[in-house]
Design a protein with these regions (language model features):
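Structured beta-strand/turn binding interfaces of compact recognition modules in eukaryotic regulators
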Residues: 3-5, 46-49, 56-58, 62-65, ...
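Nucleotide-state-sensitive switch-loop elements of NTP-binding domains
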Residues: 35-38, 42-121, 128
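Preference for solvent-exposed, low-hydrophobicity sequence contexts
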Residues: 1-8, 12, 16, 20, ...
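Beta-strand elements of modular eukaryotic interaction domains
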Residues: 30-34, 49-51, 139, 335-336
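Well-ordered alpha-helical segments embedded in enzymatic catalytic cores
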Residues: 13-16, 105-112, 136
């Protein structure tokens, strides 16, 4: 397990370590040809803010067979011989937004690795190592069967090192400290890297010869994937707006123009609420089952076991949009053991006339059709990811680039003033021109959950 504070170089070290663990293996065939292959390496990415092989907001388990020679935005998803084994849509950029769910996702991915893989495993942790983040980190040391811990940064903080040394000693795991190697070149900020990874993900245009191909056209020029949410061809079971309960009549506005996770549930929707003793065994027994869409039963965790409310879990707005109802004025994420992430999408629009979602996603339409034919339930999960402002302004940036190119060819300066920007903004659904900007009024309000993390046992499931 590789851990350390932000900016310590954990991702770079994991990249180099994975490449070093991919020794070439000669395989002799009857014809005498000896092609070069690689022993696979497991990679558990627990950094939702800057993941290596997925867009921000995902926690994933991968099997690597190819060397990684580029930054994350060059491979926003696993391709070629690399394979994503299982992923969860965390919906946030830091574990601090839901520490319990983060911990349970990590345990689920690790248990999946133990059941299916025998290769070495590299675990890349988040850079949040202070306060509750340190508690989560030490719990991971106790909860995972580690053979070694690498802490990047020999400068501390001292309380972090002391807690890690104690946890490693109790778990009989060696702890190694390495000095961070700072780059002499200027680096992009974390927000810039997230934007580049997200942009790269949504501009993917398939894989050719084991390499990702991209479409450089603005997303506004791409045809969306039209998915019904009502009727006999309904492909989206419901939407989930994580966090505090929202007024359902605003759900279409909350979805349009934002990034959502596409979650697949392997049974009826089981949400991440309060668990009782023995409920984990029940979930393990039910894992892997796929129930038909007609059985919309709601299994909520209560202190006396699994309960089924009469109202059911799925309600509909006035415009017919199905949504998972809140529990205790809050919408909890799905149980990791009974769900997985398919990827992400940008909701281009909600057509309440045809009862369809218009999605921009690199996921092939054949994948949705296959899941629908096998009666798999698909949910759209709205979390707290960055707003894709870059997608709103791509057409404007393209126009400016063409104008500069024409100026270079003709040598004449073109007039491009505020009126031209206003005309462009009038045609955009989520963009407007603000005179002088607004200081702080447009900033999203983020709420931290699970502040009483240590007050509950590690095996307990719950959110505060």
């Amino acid at each position: 397990m590789v851990c350390g504070p932000k900016g310590a170089g954990k991702s770079t070290f994991c990249r180099m370590l994975a490449n070093a663990l991919l020794p070439k293996v000669s395989k002799t065939h009857q014809d005498g040809v000896q092609p070069q292959g690689y022993d696979p390496v497991g990679f558990l990415d627990l950094d939702p803010g800057q993941p290596e092989f997925s867009p921000p907001g995902e926690l994933s388990l991968l099997k690597l067979k190819m060397c990684n020679l580029g930054p994350p935005f060059t491979h926003p998803t696993a391709c070629g011989d690399n394979e994503t084994i299982k992923a969860h849509h965390f919906g946030c950029l830091s574990p601090k937004d839901n520490t319990h769910y983060y911990y349970q996702c990590a345990l689920d991915l690790y248990s999946h690795y133990r059941r299916t893989a025998t290769s070495p495993l590299i675990i890349n942790c988040s850079g949040w190592v202070q306060g509750s983040g340190l508690e989560v980190l030490t719990d991971l040391v106790h909860g995972l069967c580690l053979t070694g811990i690498i802490y990047l940064s020999t400068t501390g903080p001292q309380e972090v090192l002391g807690a890690l040394e104690g946890a490693a000693s109790r778990s009989n795991v060696p702890l190694h400290q390495l000095t961070s190697q700072l780059s002499e070149f200027p680096t992009r900020t974390a927000a810039d890297q997230r934007m580049m990874s997200t942009l790269s993900y949504f501009h993917m245009h398939g894989v050719e010869g084991g390499n990702i191909r991209w479409n450089a056209s603005p997303l506004t020029n791409m045809a969306p994937l039209v998915v019904p949410y009502e009727g006999p061809k309904q492909a989206i079971l419901a939407i989930m707006v994580l966090g505090d309960e929202q007024n359902p009549e605003f759900y279409d506005s909350l979805l349009e123009g934002c990034v959502v996770g596409i979650a697949v549930i392997q049974q009826d929707p089981v949400v991440f609420g309060r668990s009782s003793k023995g409920s984990d065994d029940k979930m393990t027994a039910m894992e892997g089952q796929i129930l038909p869409k007609q059985g919309h039963l709601f299994q909520a965790f209560e202190q006396d076991g699994l309960q089924t409310p009469e109202s059911g879990p799925i309600l509909r707005t006035a415009s017919g949009i199905p949504y998972l109802r809140a529990q205790g004025h809050s919408v909890h994420p799905l149980l990791p053991a009974s769900s997985y992430s398919l990827g992400q999408a940008i909701v281009r629009g909600v057509d309440t006339t045809t009862k369809t979602f218009h999605l921009l996603t690199p996921i092939p339409s054949e994948t949705f059709q296959s899941l629908h034919q096998h009666n798999c339930n698909i949910l759209l999960v709205r979390g707290r990811l960055d707003t894709p402002i870059w997608a709103y302004t791509e057409q404007l940036a393209l126009g400016k680039g063409r104008r500069l190119r024409r100026e270079g060819e003709t040598g004449e300066k073109e007039v491009y003033g505020p009126d031209d920007v206003d005309k462009w903004a009038e045609k955009q659904p989520w963009a407007s021109v603000v005179e002088g900007g607004r200081s702080g009024s447009g900033k999203a309000r983020r709420i931290r959950r699970d502040l009483r993390y240590r007050s509950q046992g590690r095996g307990d499931v719950g959110s505060v």
